[in-house]
Design a protein with these regions (language model features):
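Bacterial N-terminal signal peptides that target proteins for export
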Residues: 1-7
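Bacterial N-terminal signal peptides
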Residues: 7-16
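Sec/Tat signal peptide C-region and signal peptidase I cleavage site
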Residues: 18-22
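N-terminal beta-strand motif that seeds the catalytic metal site of vicinal oxygen chelate
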Residues: 23-48, 103-108, 162
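Core segments of cupin and vicinal oxygen chelate
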Residues: 43-87, 139
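Vicinal oxygen chelate
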Residues: 45-48, 106-152
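A short acidic/small-residue loop/turn micro-motif
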Residues: 139, 162-163
Length: 163
């Protein structure tokens, strides 16, 4: 056997061993490296109507935005959303939750069953909101939830779980 072949085998075994050790270290974490959702960005064909939905129907606050890439930043004090205006609303494609990759829906917690029912009534009377289903048990319960599409078509689930 020549020395080059032996050296190649030796180097290959070192690289293989080091790679395996590195992969086992990378793949094993003692705790999650993430700390929750920082923010979520939703693309909308109608920035004004979507902003109104979050502020007027849900009571969120506008805390910023950009004019050059039309957007509004809204928050409920716990979650921060960026609403991004599509470039050409007439060419926007509605998300198909069964065939597209992407955000299936946003789920928001509601403090009480009364609040959930009140929100359902507000959504019924909000222009551009489509109700997919009214408050109902999620599976066998105890969670009660409802699903809507906000004025730009993004699906939002509202969920109350008794404590």
């Amino acid at each position: 056997m020549n020395n080059s072949f032996i050296a190649l085998c030796f180097i290959t075994s070192i690289v293989t061993t080091n790679t395996a050790m590195a992969n086992s270290t990378i793949n094993k974490l003692d705790s999650p490296i993430t700390q929750g959702v920082n923010h979520l960005g939703l693309t909308v064909p109608n920035l004004e109507k979507s902003t109104q939905f979050f502020t007027e129907t849900l009571g969120w606050k506008v805390v910023g935005g950009y004019d050059d890439y039309p957007s509004k930043f809204v928050t409920d004090g716990k979650l921060f959303l960026t609403l991004w205006q599509v470039t050409n609303p007439s060419k926007s494609i509605v998300f198909d939750r069964k065939n597209n990759v992407g955000l299936h829906h946003l789920a928001l917690s509601i403090a009480s069953l009364n609040d959930l029912n009140s929100l359902y009534e507000r959504c019924k009377n909000t222009d551009g909101v489509t109700i997919e289903f009214s408050p109902e048990a999620n599976g066998d319960g105890p969670t009660i939830h409802m699903m809507i599409r906000e004025p730009s078509g993004n699906r939002i689930e509202f969920s109350f779980t008794p404590k």
